[in-house]
């Protein structure tokens, strides 16, 4: 299972949010570019980047995001406010490894499925769930989709992954989160990436045994030093098969 060290940007700073609440971010006083380089130096294969300003239609982080793409030293999976084919192609042309699309997918599934076919392995479907409904517009609007129907609507579209976030689940209720994620993974035709479920090595150990889960985002736990990136990646590796000792 792949670990995606995760950076979330608001007003040029690294932050984490509580249940998607943009009004009370936890601000981490670190340099975004140096932090991203640190992810690469630790051996990460990808990083995930969410631009919370772009979610609100504000492009003020654009220069910083472009700098991260150029200098981080590892491919970036970018989410936040990518709501048209033009925006998706803009970032792909800038060199981003993958674009994460949620709101556009809820409103125009056919266009997003077509985009995934045109850019195979570069489009990730975001499934952000609040009280059993898929949320759009930066988690501010409840759409008409259940998570199950949303995933099913895309059939065999060649997404690079399906990023599942259970926004309202209490972080202490890991069983509920894993239930949602594993249920969607059973139905999905693309590998599922779990978001918002990793607080410790134990959480990674549980997650890696769920079928069709290809990766997990790890953000807050890295910034508050609950777990190191090296520990997270080591834990995510499959356990070695026992080898019989021959005397």
Curated annotation (Swiss-Prot):
One of its GO terms (cellular component) is cytoplasm. It catalyses: 1-(5-phospho-beta-D-ribosyl)-5-[(5-phospho-beta-D-ribosylamino)methylideneamino]imidazole-4-carboxamide = 5-[(5-phospho-1-deoxy-D-ribulos-1-ylimino)methylamino]-1-(5-phospho-beta-D-ribosyl)imidazole-4-carboxamide. It comes from Ruegeria sp. (strain TM1040). This is 1-(5-phosphoribosyl)-5-[(5-phosphoribosylamino)methylideneamino] imidazole-4-carboxamide isomerase 1. It comes from the Bacteria. The active site is at residues 8, 128. One of its GO terms (biological process) is L-tryptophan biosynthetic process. Pathway: Amino-acid biosynthesis; L-histidine biosynthesis; L-histidine from 5-phospho-alpha-D-ribose 1-diphosphate: step 4/9. The keyword Isomerase applies. The gene is hisA1. Keywords: Amino-acid biosynthesis, Cytoplasm, Histidine biosynthesis, Isomerase.
């Amino acid at each position: 299972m792949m670990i995606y060290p995760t950076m979330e940007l608001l007003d040029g700073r690294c932050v984490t949010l509580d249940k998607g609440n943009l009004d009370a971010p936890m601000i981490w006083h670190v340099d975004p570019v140096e932090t991203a380089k640190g992810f690469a130096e630790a051996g990460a294969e990808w990083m995930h980047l969410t631009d919370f300003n772009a979610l609100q239609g504000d492009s003020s982080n654009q220069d910083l995001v472009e700098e991260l793409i150029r200098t981080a030293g590892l491919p970036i999976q970018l989410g936040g406010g990518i709501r048209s084919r033009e925006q998706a192609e803009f970032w792909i042309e800038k060199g981003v490894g993958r674009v994460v699309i949620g709101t556009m997918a809820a409103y125009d599934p056919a266009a997003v499925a077509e985009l995934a076919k045109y850019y195979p392995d570069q489009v990730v479907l975001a499934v952000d769930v609040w009280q059993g409904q898929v949320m759009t517009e930066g988690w501010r609007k409840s759409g008409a989709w259940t998570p199950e129907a949303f995933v099913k609507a895309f059939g065999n579209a060649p997404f690079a992954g399906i990023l599942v976030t259970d926004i309202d689940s209490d972080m202490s209720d890991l069983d509920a989160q894993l239930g949602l994620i594993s249920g969607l993974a059973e139905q999905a035709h693309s590998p599922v990436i779990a978001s918002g479920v990793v607080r410790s090595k134990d959480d990674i150990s549980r997650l890696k045994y769920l079928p069709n889960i290809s990766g997990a985002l790890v953000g807050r736990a890295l910034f508050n030093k609950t777990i190191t990136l090296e520990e997270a990646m080591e834990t995510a590796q499959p356990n070695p098969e026992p080898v019989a000792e021959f005397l």
